[in-house]
């Protein structure tokens, strides 16, 4: 069968590569993809994510069995609804179900209604009221744009002044446009963060290995928030009892609640969690695979990925198996200056194969050449599976030291939280 992956980043590269390795899959198209993906035998389609009608026409012309939707903005724009209306199958939530991600206020309302543990909060569209709430609550405190903001709409403010400034930028200065026209202001939760993913159809779900992402740009969790600078899975120091608690107090009630609300969920559910003294609590929901977590979770899948997704969509019990030993670790290489201003067109090192996988995010061929150049903030990611986090770090960082990363940067401490002296 022929499949279509919608999106262009490292996440979509990992999804498409895994689908192409599946038994019954002959060809995988990625729209729009990036040039680095072609090195893995993937076919690019020059249609951007927002052009739903062109994507649908392409899927029909090329007899695509189903589409896998990667990015959040496409889901929020109703791409799955449009595919379904055209008689095509797509793996991802409808616009109504995706509101769990594209409105943080809606997600909070669902959590409160279905008794899901999360931070206390207030939602505001009026700056003066938001300011008064911040001053009343004190710092540290968290200010979030209600809508989608490319993973950059969250400010963990260490002072009241910082929080007020963040609220002002969103509500008065229009920093995130409509996405920041409302803000959710939350209590700061103290603890270690981790991610839990599940394949979902309605109230049926299948949990994936736990993962830990590294959001800040620089070593030691310093610098601005990014889309993610690296990750590893599973999280070796996280007790299974914590995962079980998260499943029973968070994943199950939320999915059953969405069914009860008439918004049944299909796709990948990503729960951003924090382990507090009171147990796991929700920081955020994402209604699709995470980036960079996808790149370290999918290499651990030992069953047939395309068959698994097909079964889940058809309501058939899937046979899903995971590698149950070792750790998969990945480090993102980004353009200098990311997540703020950065240059494009930096020459990239040659692709690694074998023990170290290269997933491309922002990469394009130079004109009239097969040399890859940087074409985005996050550029590529190196991933390996080893016996331990330390062994994974050694493998990746040795490889990176041998690469010419002039004009690029990466964190040197991905996975260090898992190494307990």
UniProtKB/Swiss-Prot annotation:
It comes from the Bacteria. GO terms for molecular function: ATP binding; metal ion binding; phosphoribosylamine-glycine ligase activity. Pfam families: GARS_A (PF01071), GARS_C (PF02843), GARS_N (PF02844). SUPFAM superfamilies: Glutathione synthetase ATP-binding domain-like, PreATP-grasp domain, Rudiment single hybrid motif. It is an enzyme of class 6 (ligase). Keywords: ATP-binding, Ligase, Magnesium, Manganese, Metal-binding, Nucleotide-binding, Purine biosynthesis. PROSITE patterns: ATP_GRASP (PS50975), GARS (PS00184). Residues 108-314 form the ATP-grasp domain. Signal peptide: none annotated. Binds 1 Mg(2+) or Mn(2+) ion per subunit. InterPro entries: ATP-grasp (IPR011761), ATP_grasp_subdomain_1 (IPR013815), PreATP-grasp_dom_sf (IPR016185), PRibGlycinamid_synth_ATP-grasp (IPR020561), PRibGlycinamide_synth (IPR000115), PRibGlycinamide_synth_C-dom (IPR020560), PRibGlycinamide_synth_C_sf (IPR037123), PRibGlycinamide_synth_CS (IPR020559). ATP binds at residues 134-195. Pathway: Purine metabolism; IMP biosynthesis via de novo pathway; N(1)-(5-phospho-D-ribosyl)glycinamide from 5-phospho-alpha-D-ribose 1-diphosphate: step 2/2. One of its GO terms (biological process) is purine nucleobase biosynthetic process. Mg(2+) binds at residues 284, 286. Its EC number is 6.3.4.13. Its cofactor is Mg(2+); Mn(2+). Belongs to the GARS family. NCBIfam families: purD. This is Phosphoribosylamine--glycine ligase. It comes from Streptococcus pyogenes serotype M18 (strain MGAS8232). The lineage of its organism: Bacteria, Bacillati, Bacillota, Bacilli, Lactobacillales. The gene is purD.
